Swiss-Prot record:
Region (Disordered): 159-187
Gene: rplF
GO terms classed as biological process: cytoplasmic translation
Keyword match Metal-binding: no
Name the record gives this protein: Large ribosomal subunit protein uL6
Disulfide bridges in this chain: none
């Protein structure tokens, strides 16, 4: 990660980046919205508005400073991508009679229980239901992932029958208990 942050982070013409030195806060504003990030006080931020790049510098090569340097750079890159393109997470619903539907600003999930699970949709995230898929859109990568994880937690995928809510393309291990038993026998 440290080699990636040696270069300045470029941003496109339609994105406005500003830095408040007193509050150590980077603000990224683009066509899809506005995001803010509190920068660690040890990290020095250099912003060049004419050449359209932002550079982060760390005070030392201690492992903590290297880690926080790479983390801050990755978060800023994700903010720039979020306000220009946005992020999408897709969940699939598998199971007989399992379905999801939108009712206003609430996602209603029928997942084989005696009652539907209700999930209030946060204002900074947009959710669409297409057949057996739930599409989650937003500009904040962390928020989109968090909402997807919360929806998935209503009915995690069953490794034996394959029923439940899973990420698109997620592979389930066929029999986790057997795999654990076999690994103990090998030792």
């Amino acid at each position: 990660m440290s080699r990636l942050v040696k270069k300045p982070i470029p941003y496109p013409e339609n994105v406005k980046v500003s830095y408040d030195e007193k509050e150590h806060k980077v603000t990224v504003e683009g066509p899809k919205g506005k995001l803010e990030l509190n920068i660690h006080p040890d990290i020095k931020v250099t912003l060049n508005q004419q050449e359209r790049w932002i550079k982060l510098d760390r005070p030392s090569d201690r492992s903590f400073h290297k880690a926080i340097h790479g983390t801050m750079a990755a978060l800023i890159k994700n903010m720039i991508k979020g306000v220009t393109e946005g992020f999408t997470e897709i969940l699939e619903i598998h199971g007989l009679g399992y379905r999801a539907q939108l009712k206003g600003n609430v996602l209603e999930l029928h997942l084989g229980k005696s009652h539907p699970d209700i999930y209030p949709i946060p204002p900074d995230v947009k959710i669409e239901v297409k057949g057996n898929e739930i599409h989650i859109h937003g500009i904040d990568k962390q928020r989109v992932g968090q909402v997807a994880a919360e929806i998935r937690s209503f009915r995690k995928p069953d490794p034996y029958k394959g029923k439940g809510i899973r990420y698109k393309g997620e592979q389930l291990s066929s029999n986790p208990e057997r795999l654990q038993v076999r690994s103990k026998e090998v030792r």
